[in-house]
Curated annotation (Swiss-Prot):
The keyword Phosphoprotein is annotated on this UniProt entry: no
InterPro entries noted in UniProt: ARFGAP/RecO, DNA_rep/recomb_RecO_N, NA-bd_OB-fold, RecO, RecO_C
Keywords: DNA damage, DNA recombination, DNA repair
Name this polypeptide is given: DNA repair protein RecO
A GO biological process held by the record: double-strand break repair
Biological role: Involved in DNA repair and RecF pathway recombination.
SUPFAM superfamilies tied to this protein: ArfGap/RecO-like zinc finger (SSF57863), Nucleic acid-binding proteins (SSF50249)
Domain of life, per lineage: Bacteria
Amino acid sequence: MPASRSLGMSSDARVNNESGFILHTYPFKETSVVAEVFTRAHGRVALIARGARRPASALRGLMQPFSPLLLSWFGKADLKTLHAAEWQGGLVAPQGRALMCGFYLNELLLRLLARGDAHERLYDRYVETLDQLARSAAASDAERATAFERILRRFEKNLLSEIGYGATFDVEAGGAAIEPGAAYVFQPERGALRAAGQPGCPVSGQTLLDLAGDSFERLATLGEAKALMRALINHTLGTKPLYTRQLLRELTELNP
């Protein structure tokens, strides 16, 4: 159970029983770890889990991704101190390729979310996405691959929108309505332009309208949406590539 409030600790320095997930951990000093967590009410937070690497530590088995936790911490600095963690349960852990997709989500959140910014709707979408990935793992090979693509594209689109990089997909950069039969290119800083020798990510009008309507049923839409989301995410991230994206690409090449 979470420890009681320490005397002299101001209320704004302590958070108790906050829902969250471990995104990533790394060693800190001899026996501790730093856990980057994604929480519903406080966004991304960095926590020191003191002694978590000791064999007898109650925290040791909880410092794993994709497990719903209740987290309690204190501190006003950017790096806070975890003082309690409790497993909530209720979520099936992803396995196999679904697990790699989950690590991809975590890397996106680590790279794109600023610490301390709450994103409650995105948190709920993250929980829903993990559940969808785990449940889709039981489908046939062909159905599973397509399901994973749909799930990832929806999350990418929601993530970009949540952090302020959401694009308009149903209107051209000049204000005209997107035509389903027309060919376009999409530029991250301008939007959709008629594909008349313009640089950008090639995309059909129908795919843009499908994106605007959050519809990923067409296989052609899935393929073009993947390239477009990659272009938008790369534009937001800068030059450093996503490690898990490369791993997913290599897995696809090994298991076509």
